[in-house]
Amino acid sequence: QHIPHFYLKVVVEAKKLFELYKKTKSQIPCSVNDFVVMACAMAIRQFPAFRSQYKNSQIIESENVNIGVAVGLDDGLVVPVLVDADKMNLSSLSARTKVIVENARNGKIDGMGKGIFTVTNLGMFGTEEFSAIINPPESAILAVGAIREDIKVVNESIKATRLMTMTLSVDHRVIDGVMAAKFAAAVKEILENPEQLIK
C-alpha cells in the first residue's frame, strides 16, 4: 500500500440510532450498517471530494455515489458496491445490500472498480474501534465499531447512553484534514439525528 493515509476518529452518540433501528427492523429487515451507509451517502453529496478516485496520479471525480460494503469471506475481504447509494431509501438499500453480499459469498462481486468510498463494520464481532486500509482507487474508508452501552454526564446527572466509534481513513493526496473532519462531523450529525434517514 502506497496510499498516504490520514486517520480521524469520531464517537457517535447512538442511542437514537439504536432505538430507531429496533423500531424499523420490524417493518424493514435492515441492519445498523444500512443506516451508516445511508448517512455516508447523504454526507458524500455535500462533499464532492469524497466522490473521487486516485488513478494514474490523477484525481478523478465521479458523478455517482457508489459505496462499497466490505464483506468478510473465509479467504479474505471483498468489497461489492452499491451503485447510486444516495438515490435509495432504507428499504431498497437494505434489500440491495443483502443481494450484493450474497452474490459476493457466491463469488460474484457487484460494481467491481466503481466504488468511491467503502464502509467496513466489525461491530458484530464486538470490536469497538479499528482503523481500515483504503481500498484503491477509492480515496476514503469508514471503519465502524460496535454500539456499546455507556454513561454520560448531563447537568451533573449521570445518564445511560449508547456510543459507536467510527474511524475515517482518507487518502491525503485527495482529501485534506479539514475536509475529512467536516465530513466525519456531517456523518456523525446525521447518525445522531437519524429520523432524516427514513423520510
Which role fits each region the language model picked out?
Residues 1-199:
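C-terminal catalytic/motor cores of large multi-domain enzyme assemblies
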